């Protein structure tokens, strides 16, 4: 691609993402499917703006590379060692069982046995990028099903290496006498990377961090990711595996969080580019001429993989409620199929349209996954939200709650217990299945599901409830629920949890007057006790605490219109000085009033 063509392609990618992803989010089908649809629209079989799909697809694999580095940062070697049985046990079983079944089915459709073996192995792989993104979106990272899913994906990454080595042998082009010297050099180079990374990376990053220049640290992080990817690629190994190992080597370092911050923006953009490229690679011509074969293939592929994964999840001891999400999130074909099938095609293993049919099947299966997960969510919601005839009468008997609580973590539990102690009728909306099970045992009226969906809020009684308390961990979810309630349930008073000043400003801008910053009150209380320990009278300390709370809220409201404007930093400092002077004057006036508490803020 020439420079101008590359610039035009970049603009088209960004434009397609900006248009398609918000529309997909509004339709509730997820950002990943939005990226795929955007790729179809601008690709050679859509509007035809971009035709060089192969080059862009190869470049976009960097999104998976960055993602695997960040995953490695979250896993230290001890955690990885604990996963060894699920990686080489369940992971190996999934690839083997899925490949055998799918290869057998391909042989029934006139594939030669060599092509069927390659096709079965390729289709057995799942999309690391899509599965991990969906697991994060669904909060599966903290569940046993999510950990098992990650183990399966990691084994698939490892399995790609011998699978690629097998292709020339199946084609009859393999060497009778392998070059053991070449193999030994690759193993030695890999060992050097491990040892060098173990002992050199931390001193290098310590030296770079000592410069105090953030841009240099970001450049070093990018150099590490891209360098390890290139090194593994030169060895003929998986680029994603190389960056994953680099991440693990730094997982216990003091620079872990700084590296995550430096890499995160690049990961998001490149992952979006990857999904757009996959959408562009969809051959609509083959789809049109073989529509029945392709549709049946997608259904069979997703069904076979879900059945295998569900059975393995049951064998592993996953709870019934975690088996379906575990099976669904890995049910698609993956990006490694593109690499494997391309290698097989170069060895003349496929005939006629066989490779194109397999690639279309993989691409469409990736597009079904967000819809499959949405269906699983609805199925689980119907299961959990259905009334249990054998259950004891719950503490909350009225079908019309006074208060709806969204999220029942540590913050939400305190609110719920306080309301229950005062005989208030509450309904809890929670996405964590284990929390739903526990809450129902204690007699709470709980709905499983995503509170950003209008129908779930209606089912929970939002049309008649007096208040809703939003305690989500995700600020974006909080704002979605706030806007949804303002639009459809204006009678409800909205109370929300803010994790900090930025979220507090956003809530104020949205018109939410009742909110609580999660650390502010506890910090003020500890500050009051500190003043008392320094000799201040308890009444004065209480009054100082209340004054500070009132003045801080005033500053929060005054600075709300300019909180996103970097040019207004001087205005922030000026306002802070003004409020400190006001606080000092008020405290001076009441310095001699040692008795009596202020009633209100």
From Swiss-Prot:
Matching Gene3D superfamilies: 1.20.1530.20, NAD(P)-binding Rossmann-like Domain
GO MF annotations, alphabetized: glutathione-regulated potassium exporter activity
Q: Which purpose does this protein serve, as stated in its record?
A: Pore-forming subunit of a potassium efflux system that confers protection against electrophiles. Catalyzes K(+)/H(+) antiport.
UniProt subcellular location: Cell inner membrane
Q: Which residues form the RCK N-terminal domain?
A: 400-519
PROSITE patterns under this entry?
A: RCK_N
User: What interactions and quaternary structure are annotated?
Assistant: Interacts with the regulatory subunit KefG.
The cross-references to NCBIfam families, in alphabetical order and at most eight, read: 2a37 (TIGR00932), PRK03659.1 (NF002973)
Highest taxon listed in the record's lineage: Bacteria
User: Which positions, given as ranges, span the membrane?
Assistant: 5-25, 29-49, 55-75, 87-107, 115-135, 152-172, 181-201, 207-227, 230-250, 268-288, 291-311, 324-344, 356-376
HAMAP family in the record: K_H_efflux_KefB
Family that this chain belongs to: Belongs to the monovalent cation:proton antiporter 2 (CPA2) transporter (TC 2.A.37) family. KefB subfamily.
Keywords in alphabetical order = Antiport, Cell inner membrane, Cell membrane, Ion transport, Membrane, Potassium, Potassium transport, Transmembrane, Transmembrane helix, Transport
Q: Supply the InterPro entries for this chain.
A: Cation/H_exchanger_TM, K/H_exchanger, K_H_efflux_KefB, Na+/solute_symporter_sf, NAD(P)-bd_dom_sf, RCK_N
Q: How does it sit in the membrane?
A: Multi-pass membrane protein
Gene symbol?
Answer: kefB
UniProt cross-references to PANTHER family, sorted A to Z: K(+) EFFLUX ANTIPORTER 3, CHLOROPLASTIC (PTHR46157:SF4)
What does the entry list under GO cellular component? plasma membrane
What name goes with this protein?
Answer: Glutathione-regulated potassium-efflux system protein KefB
Report the record's Gene Ontology biological process terms. Answer: proton transmembrane transport
User: What Pfam families does the database record attribute to this sequence?
Assistant: Na_H_Exchanger (PF00999), TrkA_N (PF02254)
């Amino acid at each position: 691609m020439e420079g101008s063509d590359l610039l035009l392609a970049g603009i088209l990618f960004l434009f397609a993402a900006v248009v398609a992803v918000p529309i997909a989010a509004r339709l509730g089908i997820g950002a990943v499917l939005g990226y795929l649809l955007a790729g179809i629209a601008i690709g050679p079989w859509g509007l035809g703006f971009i035709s060089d799909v192969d080059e862009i697809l190869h470049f976009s694999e960097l999104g998976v590379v960055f993602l695997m580095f960040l995953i490695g940062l979250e896993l230290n070697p001890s955690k990885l060692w604990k996963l060894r049985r699920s990686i080489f046990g369940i992971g190996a079983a999934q690839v083997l069982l899925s490949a055998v079944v799918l290869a057998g089915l391909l042989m029934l459709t006139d594939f030669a046995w060599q092509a069927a073996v390659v096709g079965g192995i390729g289709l057995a792989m799942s999309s690391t990028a899509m599965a991990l993104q969906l697991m994060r979106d669904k909060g599966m990272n903290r569940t046993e099903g999510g950990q098992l899913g990650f183990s399966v994906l990691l084994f698939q990454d490892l399995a790609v290496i011998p699978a690629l080595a097998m292709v020339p042998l199946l084609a009859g082009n393999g060497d009778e006498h392998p070059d053991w010297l070449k193999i030994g050099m690759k193993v030695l180079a890999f060992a050097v990377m491990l040892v060098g990374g173990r002992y050199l990376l931390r001193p290098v990053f310590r030296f770079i961090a000592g410069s105090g220049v953030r841009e240099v640290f970001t450049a070093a992080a990018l150099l590490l990711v891209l360098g390890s990817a290139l090194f593994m690629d030169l060895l003929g190994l998986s680029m994603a595996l190389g960056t994953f190992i680099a991440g693990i080597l730094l997982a216990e370092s003091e620079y872990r969080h700084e590296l995550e911050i430096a890499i995160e923006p690049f990961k998001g953009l490149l992952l979006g580019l990857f999904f757009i490229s996959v959408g562009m690679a969809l051959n609509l011509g083959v789809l049109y001429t073989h529509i029945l074969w392709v549709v049946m293939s997608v259904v069979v592929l997703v069904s076979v993989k879900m059945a295998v994964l569900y059975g393995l999840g049951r064998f592993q001891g996953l709870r019934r409620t975690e088996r379906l999400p575990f099976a669904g999130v890995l049910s698609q074909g993956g990006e490694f199929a593109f690499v494997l099938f391309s290698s097989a095609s170069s060895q003349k293993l496929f005939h006629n349209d066989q490779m194109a049919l397999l690639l279309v099947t993989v691409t469409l299966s990736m597009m079904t996954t967000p819809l499959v997960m949405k269906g699983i969510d609805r199925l689980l919601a119907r299961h959990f939200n259905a009334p249990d005839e054998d259950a004891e009468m719950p503490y909350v008997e009225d079908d019309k709650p006074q208060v709806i609580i969204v999220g029942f973590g540590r913050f939400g539990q305190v609110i719920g217990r306080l309301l229950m102690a005062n005989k208030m009728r509450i309904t809890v909306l929670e996405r964590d299945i284990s929390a739903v099970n526990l809450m129902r045992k204690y007699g709470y009226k709980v709905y499983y599901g995503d509170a950003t969906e209008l129908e779930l809020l209606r089912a929970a009684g939002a049309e008649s409830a007096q208040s809703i308390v939003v305690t989500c961990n995700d600020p974006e979810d909080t704002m979605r629920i706030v806007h949804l309630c303002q639009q459809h349930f204006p009678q409800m008073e909205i109370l929300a949890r803010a994790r900090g000043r930025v979220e507090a400003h956003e809530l104020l801008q949205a018109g939410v007057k009742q909110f609580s910053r999660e650390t502010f009150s506890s910090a003020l209380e500890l500050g009051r006790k500190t003043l008392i320990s320094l000799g201040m009278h308890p009444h004065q300390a209480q009054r100082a605490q209340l004054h500070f709370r009132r003045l801080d809220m005033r500053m929060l409201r005054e600075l709300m219109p300019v909180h996103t404007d970097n040019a207004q930093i001087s205005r922030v400092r000026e306002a802070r000085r003004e409020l400190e002077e006001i606080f000092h004057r008020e405290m001076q006036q009441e310095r001699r009033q040692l008795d009596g508490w202020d009633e209100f803020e």
